[in-house]
């Protein structure tokens, strides 16, 4: 999936593995402060991180939001998701489409990565429901693995040592902002975007990003 982003980023100065600790402005421009002390200057900023993380960066930089902006961002909420990935010793037994949405139980979605053509060996990805993820968030990986595999009822066994558990606290928006982006008021150009703005999933995130790009270009007096 990152192939699209890589293609769009050709020719850009892209920094990876750079943890941002705060966002600071002086009324005219922004300073992005990294955890290692590096400071990057910017005329404007677009953020697509989950809103709680964006708010934490702004708070760390001493940025005060207007009441309207604070209320709009506080209204956005997310569901968590615990994901399990595992390699099997044979076929999963899922249908030809390679994905199943169970009607009940702890599993929200199962995908056969081999049938989808993204794995050379039999392998599955299991997403737990928001409720299971919430209640079992701090449970040991072994307990989560047992519960999800029991519910999955796969035809083949999991290869020892192949299970990976991932926890996404802000996996998907449960309450979205009604517009494609939100430009913060009374500060240098700063646009919030992402899958929580005007439509979840990949399509919504892409549309939000395109709208945010136009908004920041306009705010900076450039042609989008």
Predicted regions and their residues:
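Active-site-proximal substrate-binding core of FAD-dependent oxidoreductases
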Residues: 74, 215-224
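Short beta-strand to alpha-helix junction loop
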Residues: 1-7, 15, 138-147
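Active-site substrate-recognition segment that forms the wall
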Residues: 85-136, 143, 147-155
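Flavin (FAD/FMN) cofactor-binding core of flavoprotein oxidoreductases
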Residues: 146, 151-188
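Glycine-centered tight beta-turn/hairpin loop motif at sheet-sheet or coil-to-beta transitions
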Residues: 35-37
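Short FAD-binding loop at a beta-strand-to-alpha-helix junction that anchors the flavin cofactor
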Residues: 124, 180-213
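A conserved short coil-to-beta-strand element within the FAD-binding core of flavoproteins
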Residues: 16-31
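Central helical "cap/lid" subdomain
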Residues: 39-96, 158
């Amino acid at each position: 999936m990152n192939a699209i982003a890589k293609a769009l980023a050709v020719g850009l100065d892209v920094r990876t593995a750079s943890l941002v600790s705060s966002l600071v402005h002086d009324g005219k421009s922004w300073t992005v402060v990294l955890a290692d002390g590096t400071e990057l200057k910017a005329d404007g900023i677009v953020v697509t991180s989950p809103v709680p993380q964006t708010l934490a960066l702004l708070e760390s930089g001493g940025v005060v939001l207007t009441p309207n902006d604070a209320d709009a961002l506080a209204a956005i909420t997310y569901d968590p998701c615990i994901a399990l990935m595992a390699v099997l010793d044979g076929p999963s037994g899922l249908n030809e489409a390679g994905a199943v949405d169970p009607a009940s139980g702890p599993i929200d979605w199962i995908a056969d990565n081999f049938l989808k053509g993204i794995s050379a060996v039999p392998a599955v990805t299991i997403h737990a429901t928001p409720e299971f993820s919430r209640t079992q968030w701090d449970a040991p990986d072994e307990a989560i693995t047992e519960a999800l595999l029991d519910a999955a009822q796969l035809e083949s066994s999991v290869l020892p040592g192949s299970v990976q558990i991932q926890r996404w606290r802000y996996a998907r928006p449960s309450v979205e902002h009604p517009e494609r982006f939100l430009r913060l008021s009374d500060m240098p150009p700063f646009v919030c975007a992402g899958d929580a703005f005007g439509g979840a999933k990949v399509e919504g995130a892409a549309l939000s990003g395109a709208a945010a790009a136009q908004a920041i270009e306009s705010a900076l007096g450039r042609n989008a």
